[in-house]
């Protein structure tokens, strides 16, 4: 068993960049039927952060999807020797194959890695502590603080 599995690496689709700016994005489709996604991912700071990443990716000629998987594989604290893994999913078989293949391109440029760091600094105040989502807000190990 893995020590850590990355689940939902595209942050409910927000990291694909397909939704555009927060002000213009529609909550129709996947977000309408997933109120948990609205609460977790539909935040202005997240959309702004994706724009930071998207601009750096455009300069490199890659997508935010490719950059996200490569960042996770080569620049995060994941460690395959500990059994860490990325749960890769897709709505189509071709997308799944692309998601797997994209990691083979290797590490990202410093400019894209820096964009991820800037994006994180921009939105980290809005990011939940996931362990508290499932054990009660403010809890550690299931017990109230």
Residue ranges and their predicted role:
Residues 9, 39-105:
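Conserved short secondary-structure transition element at the edge of the structured enzyme core
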Residues 35, 62-64, 113, 127:
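Intrinsically disordered, low-complexity regions enriched in Ser/Pro/Gly/Gln/His and often acidic
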Residues 1-56, 129-145:
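Glycine-rich, positively charged active-site loop/lid region within alpha/beta enzyme cores that binds
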Residues 6, 66, 109-112:
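A generic structural-conservation signal
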Residues 93-96, 100-134:
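Extended hydrophobic/aromatic segments used for targeting, binding, or gating
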Residues 25, 81-87, 103-105, 126-133, ...:
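Short, charged low-complexity intrinsically disordered segments located at boundaries
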């Amino acid at each position: 068993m893995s020590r850590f599995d990355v689940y939902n690496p595209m942050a409910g689709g927000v990291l694909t960049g397909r939704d555009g700016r927060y002000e213009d994005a529609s909550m129709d489709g996947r977000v309408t039927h997933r109120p948990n996604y609205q609460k977790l991912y539909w935040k202005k700071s997240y959309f702004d952060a994706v724009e930071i990443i998207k601009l750096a990716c455009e300069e490199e000629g890659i997508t935010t999807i490719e950059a996200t998987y490569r960042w996770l594989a080569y620049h995060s604290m994941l460690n395959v020797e500990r059994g860490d893994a990325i749960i890769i999913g897709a709505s189509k078989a071709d997308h799944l194959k692309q998601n797997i293949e994209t990691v083979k391109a290797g590490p990202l440029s410093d400019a894209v890695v820096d964009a991820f760091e800037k994006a994180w600094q921009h939105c980290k105040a809005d990011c939940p502590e996931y362990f508290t989502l499932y054990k009660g807000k403010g809890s550690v190990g299931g017990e109230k603080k």
